[in-house]
């Protein structure tokens, strides 16, 4: 079964986190998503001083794509002298994972990946976030 509810949580993720109940219930769904996002951020081991915007974008990409593909992109960034904590650099390498040559690089563990949906997801969430912030600050 596919993603469910407001935060589009996969049922298998709910099981992994031991969360039962109705995933279409907004409160249950959002609470589970918060747990998932928090676990993702903690597991990424960002360098001190990593800007919150970069953190947010990288975590959102993990939430959407699965952490493995983003870890690959961060490994590629690190290997080729880019910043694995910069969304600009990580998104560049994430988009390159659709290339079979890049996907076969020794830094890649999770194979090829078409990142277009994930990159759009991150852009859309961040644009909505900016809109909400600007409306709230009025």
Q: Residue locations for each model-derived region?
A:
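Short, surface-exposed glycine/acidic/tryptophan-bearing loops
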Residues: 1-16, 79
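Non-catalytic cell-wall polysaccharide-engagement segments
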Residues: 15-138
């Amino acid at each position: 079964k596919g993603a469910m509810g407001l935060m589009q949580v996969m049922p298998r993720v709910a099981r992994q986190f031991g969360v039962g109940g109705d995933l279409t219930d907004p409160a249950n769904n959002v609470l589970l998503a918060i747990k998932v996002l928090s676990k993702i951020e903690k597991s990424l081991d960002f360098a001190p001083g990593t800007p919150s915007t970069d953190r947010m974008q990288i975590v959102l990409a993990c939430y959407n794509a699965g952490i493995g593909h983003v870890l690959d992109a961060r490994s590629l960034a690190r290997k080729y002298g880019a910043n694995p904590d910069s969304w600009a650099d990580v998104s560049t390498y994430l988009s390159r994972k659709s290339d079979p040559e890049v996907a076969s690089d020794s830094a890649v563990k999770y194979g090829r990946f078409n990142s277009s949906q994930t990159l759009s997801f991150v852009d859309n969430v961040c644009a909505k976030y900016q809109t909400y912030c600007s409306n709230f600050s009025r």
